[in-house]
Amino acid sequence: MTLSVGWFATARGQTSGKLLAGALTAIEDGRLDAEVAVVFCNRDPGEDANADAFQEQVRAAGIPLVTLSSREFRRAAGGEVARKGEPLPEWRREYDREVMRLLAPHEFDIGVLAGYMLIFCEEAAAKWDLLNLHPAAPGGPAGMWQDVIWELIAQGADRAGVMIHLATPELDEGPVVTYCTYQIRGGEIDELWRDADARGVEAARAEKGEELPLFREIRRRGVLREVPLVIETLRTFADERVQVRDKQPVDASGAVIEGYDLSEEIERIVAESG
């Protein structure tokens, strides 16, 4: 069965384009039996340079593109910015309803949130089965990738991870579908840990910020695994090894799963890619 995918991205950075390109390449070379039925971006053309480049990539691939600026929608509604940990303001619910209306002509089996910076309201999360890419292992730090990395450094963690979970109205708390973990200790990275420890985490963060070598290396290792995890996860759906029933991931027998550990497959792919 060819899996039909809806793709959602804010495209604030270049990673969104890399994720989509990786999926399209896997489709083209036959590794993934899927099609991207539609791409949605919550930035309008001309609003952001990175989003513009992403949208041009979508158009060049011949994929239907739908855009609706969440920023301009909020301004037109006179609404306040949604705050972490607080209920979504009414304008956000109205925005999601408009997104659902715009996407109604485009049916898809599963949605992928790849760098989509908005939390869906209950109605949208109930309407679609949505996979969210989160740059931490199950049970790991919540929040944006920057927050995750700083928390890993503060913890002095040995391992990091990437997971894909079902999106819910609660930030990064949906049922885990797949994940992988990887070492952030041992070998050359240990020297970067020693440098960060010598500075002190807070001092290093204040002085170097995201240019801290340890921060950059942890981020590099995570990004290397994001595209393979997205592709391998979509393969589990295309092969019907995993499905979503009643907002829970289940295996081919219908049993609820706690998340497939794809670490072995992802490490093999990373090693083969050099």
Where are these regions (language model features)?
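One-carbon transfer enzymes
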Residues: M1-G274
